[in-house]
């Protein structure tokens, strides 16, 4: 698992390789990742937008931006946690993801929180640092 805290918001990510959806012979590798966001602060916040930077094993970069996560813009009161699962395909057997969530404080001010960088490794390649 990978974890990072920004402004009392903790983001934890756990990636999973999806062998049943991957086709290594066709250079198609798929991962799911489970994200848990915990508000450890004293103010209510809302997740407004996501921004992912996905890099494959040969350095090709794809950026993904959009409102919310999995169709939701969750509100997290102090002590609340929100979890979701999503996924990404790559044309290489490994890669890395990192990103940010744009949050809004209860007073309407926006700020970014970090999504920790995490490695996407398939069993079809020896693990390495990306």
UniProtKB/Swiss-Prot annotation:
Pfam families: DUF525 (PF04379). One of its GO terms (biological process) is error-free translesion synthesis. Residues 3-127 form the ApaG domain. InterPro entries: ApaG_domain, ApaG_sf, Uncharacterised_ApaG. PANTHER family: F-BOX ONLY PROTEIN 3, POLYMERASE DELTA-INTERACTING PROTEIN 2. This is Protein ApaG. The lineage of its organism: Bacteria, Pseudomonadati, Pseudomonadota, Alphaproteobacteria, Rhodospirillales. The gene is apaG.
